[in-house]
Amino acid sequence: MARIVTFGELMLRLQPYNYERFVQCDHVEFTFGGGEANVAVSLANYGMDAAFVTKLPAHAIGQAAVNSLRRYGVDTSLIVRGGDRVGIYFNEKGASQRGSVCIYDRAHSAIQEAKPSDFDWDKIFEGADWFHFTGITPALGPNVVEICREACKAAKAHGCKISCDLNYRGKLWTRAQAREAMTDLCQYVDVCISNEEDAKDVFGIEAEATDIYGGSLNHEGYKSVAKQLADKFGFEMVAITLRESHSAFDNGWSAMLYNVSKNEYCFSKKYNLHIIDRVGGGDSFGGGLIYSLLSGKDTQAAVEFAVAASALKHSIEGDYNMVTVPEVEKLAGGDGSGRIQR
């Protein structure tokens, strides 16, 4: 069984019930999530040995965060305990033409104030096959950039493949800061994951004839984006998710996977989604892609599985994608009817 290690911040998610706005709500839902943790949950649900690494306080909220991963079979034994705060994000779900709003309260969280010496990466990567992180994690501060760098170096020394989802977050750092840090970290990466605008935000690489906010994407233009990324950093594969946003409820959803050694550009089928919760949609794609590549799927099958997994996640409340391999394969195989199973 393949072993995957992911590293990042696990946050407390506070969200008004239903589609209420922050200014009107009296109660919030209390759950947990975070980019790399979401990927670990997906992989554990697919039967893989997935470990999540972070730093969390040793108090009850920190333990609740750990328990949220344990219930899905994620290995939490490598989580460092210490610090005072669990990072929080407040999520206001959008509806119709009103977009969702995310407000961060993560300053001085345990992982943001972590030191490189907190993590024994040689021990962490014993027996590991794959390492995954996202661009959200180094955005937490220069110390976390250094932690990510040390993790990547150790992962390479242990023979791991490394994947990174660029995941640009403008509320955490500037484009210039992102470009400097991610240019350094991407030299270690084998599989790069981006959405339709991350490559532009981080590296200034964009698809021609594309109107992201108008919901119109030139899919062919993303071949050039993938090739430019691969040429710049020597990636083995580049995956780009393609979201056509018509409203907060209705999106077109597909992806492209560029296999450099085979010079293959494979596009998935497109799903017309009616969204229940889009948070974690990209992470569920990443989890599906890692599973597919570790399972030996070819380029087309890999991107189809990853997109189908993510399409299902958009129907599930919360950050985590609680689906199984047979459920994903059923959708990827063409059964998207949503009919009741008896």
Map each language-model feature to its residues.
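Short catalytic helix/loop segments, enriched in acidic residues and glycine
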Residues: R21-V39
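Histidine-anchored nucleotide/phosphate-binding helix
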Residues: G35-N45, C148-A154
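Conserved post-catalytic alpha-helical subdomain immediately downstream of the catalytic base
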Residues: Y265-D335
